[in-house]
């Protein structure tokens, strides 16, 4: 399983820990990944995703999973999130047609 956020694409970074004497030690910086279940209002179902804490705050800020995915670019999303985004777009396109 890749250490990558399914919503933002954040992954492992490589860098140096630098001491006071400027000695550099190679280090891996891992993303803060959480297994969460998010509710999709448009689809009426819960979706389990592996996302970073930063992405979780962004989802809350945008007003839920549906709003986040609609605004998100396709490049950062995982395959699962892309399929979910397409399903949400289809469902939202059907809903106004049925109401009118």
Swiss-Prot record:
Keywords: Ribonucleoprotein, Ribosomal protein. The lineage of its organism: Bacteria, Pseudomonadati, Pseudomonadota, Alphaproteobacteria, Hyphomicrobiales. It comes from the Bacteria. This is Large ribosomal subunit protein bL28. Disulfide bonds: none annotated. One of its GO terms (biological process) is translation. Gene3D superfamilies: Ribosomal protein L28/L24. Belongs to the bacterial ribosomal protein bL28 family. Transmembrane segments: none annotated. PANTHER family: 39S RIBOSOMAL PROTEIN L28, MITOCHONDRIAL, LARGE RIBOSOMAL SUBUNIT PROTEIN BL28M. One of its GO terms (molecular function) is structural constituent of ribosome. One of its GO terms (cellular component) is cytosolic large ribosomal subunit.
């Amino acid at each position: 399983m890749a250490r990558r956020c399914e919503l933002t694409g954040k992954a492992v970074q490589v860098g140096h820990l630098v001491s006071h004497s400027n000695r550099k030690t190679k280090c891996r910086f891992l993303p803060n990944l959480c297994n969460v279940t998010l509710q999709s209002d448009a689809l009426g179902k819960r979706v389990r995703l592996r996302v970073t804490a930063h992405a979780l705050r962004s989802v809350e800020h945008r007003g839920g999973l549906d709003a986040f995915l609609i605004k998100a670019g396709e490049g950062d999303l995982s395959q699962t999130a892309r399929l979910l985004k397409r399903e949400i777009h289809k469902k939202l396109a059907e809903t106004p047609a049925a109401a009118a």
